[in-house]
Curated annotation (Swiss-Prot):
UniProt keyword annotations, A-Z: Repeat
Gene Ontology molecular function: any one: RNA binding
NCBIfam families reported in the protein's UniProt record: PPR (TIGR00756)
Family from the record: Belongs to the PPR family. PCMP-H subfamily.
Region (Type E(+) motif): 566-596
Region (Type E motif): 490-565
Organism: Arabidopsis thaliana
Name assigned to this protein: Pentatricopeptide repeat-containing protein At4g37170
UniProt-listed GO biological process terms: RNA modification
Database matches in Gene3D superfamilies: Tetratricopeptide repeat domain
Amino acid sequence: MNHSNARKLTTLHGFILKRNLSSFHASLKRFSDKKFFNPNHEDGGVVVERLCRANRFGEAIDVLCGQKLLREAVQLLGRAKKPPASTYCNLIQVCSQTRALEEGKKVHEHIRTSGFVPGIVIWNRLLRMYAKCGSLVDARKVFDEMPNRDLCSWNVMVNGYAEVGLLEEARKLFDEMTEKDSYSWTAMVTGYVKKDQPEEALVLYSLMQRVPNSRPNIFTVSIAVAAAAAVKCIRRGKEIHGHIVRAGLDSDEVLWSSLMDMYGKCGCIDEARNIFDKIVEKDVVSWTSMIDRYFKSSRWREGFSLFSELVGSCERPNEYTFAGVLNACADLTTEELGKQVHGYMTRVGFDPYSFASSSLVDMYTKCGNIESAKHVVDGCPKPDLVSWTSLIGGCAQNGQPDEALKYFDLLLKSGTKPDHVTFVNVLSACTHAGLVEKGLEFFYSITEKHRLSHTSDHYTCLVDLLARSGRFEQLKSVISEMPMKPSKFLWASVLGGCSTYGNIDLAEEAAQELFKIEPENPVTYVTMANIYAAAGKWEEEGKMRKRMQEIGVTKRPGSSWTEIKRKRHVFIAADTSHPMYNQIVEFLRELRKKMKEEGYVPATSLVLHDVEDEQKEENLVYHSEKLAVAFAILSTEEGTAIKVFKNLRSCVDCHGAIKFISNITKRKITVRDSTRFHCFENGQCSCGDYW
């Protein structure tokens, strides 16, 4: 502050003290900051001083309001005997803008005690101030006290109630209104959409169409489009689209984006693309929304193609675009494309470690590249909870439980608070490693140490851990003490453990619970049939398969795929359609001879008992993951690591066979089934035969 301004401030300070305005003293410092004394308002202090000397406090207050010095302005209001209406208007306006409820109440109280009779403008400003500050009780008191109300008064109250979700109060006032404009309707329709009542919003919008002189504006139809999208009602969406065209609002590109989103959410992807193509000035939000619609509809190729168009346009992808594309790569396990996106982000100057780390970690872990996932987290200055959690889960699924627990420890040391998903992954790591006592310790720490509540997922993980370890009595005790009803996932875990240990009685109990929850899920029937077969109970096994046939349940075929030179090759069990099928089967037969020489014994116990032993062995050759592994070996150079993905859990025979294949071919073979990654190398699997 220069010498001239300091002198002016000193003069003003002295004047205030003489006038016994000592409450100003604590606020004087604010007059000297850059908000008040700046090149455009360097004489502000002099103006306030001069006006106060002349007892023109109302005008001084106006100056302070102009400088947004609300507290000082309200303090000075006590010196003003009869400030003009404009002064009250200015004060209330600043209170509204800054959400200053306490100052607003002081201004309102001054109006009451000063004898000033407010007009409709000031009443409405008081209403709006209380509503914007979220004090609807005070707003309603003002509304009820008003001698007269205009349309604005009603609109402010209706909108205020709707904004905070008090829809019953809002609708009651709305229905009492003798006159409504587009603002009234929009406030009510918006309130219903925000409160997740899109059906009510659409009913009200339809009613609006039938009311004379109630023409919807661009905001009304935007909200109506969002409501149609929320209920996925394409008929209503198309009706609103027609209204937009008839009302001449179809030149607004924001509306086009809303329509595109509506068509996409209703599953009309081609219509959404037509709208997208009509948008002249496409922003990154439009691009990202359309790309996301393709991915959510499993139209992957078109989604990636549109992303390529975006990259070639003058518009630049943002963090949401990259996250969506990386998530698609994760879902499809297309690591090569994911790496390209990662590289592109870096080349164009985005910092992938700052905003897309969780998507990158998820992509790399789902593709089985756990080292790259670790590199992403290790490179983050401050990884977020999602990144930590994804990596912990990835380590668990990739057969690195010790690494999973190490990163959980690092998460805690970083000051990040774990959530219930984090503990699901931590418990999963213990499950995959058979760390029962450690898992129990983590389970009880959720409530005792971290002050979180146990969820159904936590109990499912604990039961899975106990089931895989054969601790069935302890498992029963946990289930009986659960505060919630056991889920289908929990009973499936019980059934899986019973399958491993041949616990038929408990398996039948779990199966009965699953039949109640999901009577058409083939996995339960197949698992029970296999349990009976393994125990030599062929009559029960036959009854189970007959039951499947009677109710029309069919086993989902196993399918496996591998990517060679950016082309995906999919194999289904016993499918002969692949052009290299004969070569693949012959190669597997040769491998089987070598495997037997090294001690391989085919696991034929689960194959139908009325088939000859030789045919049982032959049937095992045609399992989808064996076909995919053999093809990948034949299609790559010697020593190349290969990856295969499967939609179901690996069977015992395939798991054992691939261990032998990895040793014979000297290959690192990674297989991701429905539960985890299996990394086979030198005749061993990362799961330790515990899956």
